[in-house]
Amino acid sequence: MRLSDGGRLIAFTLLSASIAQPGFAAKFNDLEHTRIDYPRPADLPSDAAMEAAGAVIGKIDIDVRNIFDESDQRETNKLYRLADRLHIRTKPSTIRAQLLFKSGEKYQARKLAETERALRLLTFIYDARVVPVHYADGKVEIKVITKDVWTLSPGISFGRSGGTNSTKFNLEEENLLGWGKTVQVSRGSTVDRTSNTVALTDPNVFGSHWTSAVSYSDSSDGSQRAALIQHPFYSLDTTWSAKIVGLSFDRTVSRYNLGNIVDQFNDNQSAYELSGGLSNGYIDGWTRRWTFGMRYDRNIFLPTPGTSTPT
């Protein structure tokens, strides 16, 4: 395909499902941490009995534990103790924002189990337990226990190709100051460009179930900007979702022959997405969701001064 000066490629796409947003993790993956052992009290009535009695949730106690277990001999060496001292433990308010229940609500055992699964999916949590521990006067006391992981991930890499060196430096923290937010800064240099990038992700904006993410990259040949705001289906009972995404970047693309630049052109791209979903919630053991959305993409290719039009 040959494009004339100022050629434009524009596309609209109808989405049938939302796109998951991946996260990043640095979890001492080569270590076998001790799992949380907190059994349910033997004298506590069954979940079915408490639900049938119309029990409500009373006090919610949150216990955030450090990375390593001092009571486990496998996790008591000096390196692990140093990691625990340097690590900023997750704030109880960060964990509370993830709970799918609150004091005063009707007790439902499935919400405790779902909360436990959701906590284990967080990149800054290694293990979690959500257990009813006491029942009296129609109220159930809940204990939420979590165990942190190491979340600071520095990285450096070097390479050489075609007679040119490439380097990359990266620093990522997935639980900034214990708030559950991810911040990433990086600098990379390749044969084509040198880039500096900063990104921030907040999974619970102001303690809500809204998620936001922004990033900015400044390159020697352009820049890139991206932003996301999303209200996901965060539980089986969630009745709606919404997402807005915006992305734009510009760069210079080079074509080589025997290591020499023979042609260049400017590539300007932008993309926007608006999507959402509806659900009746959790009914008779089922959750049904209907998702919809629209995506707009625009690519503009322009020759740089002194070069030919791209083909």
Language-model segments: residues:
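Immediate N-terminus of the mature polypeptide
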Residues: 2-3, 9-15, 21-311
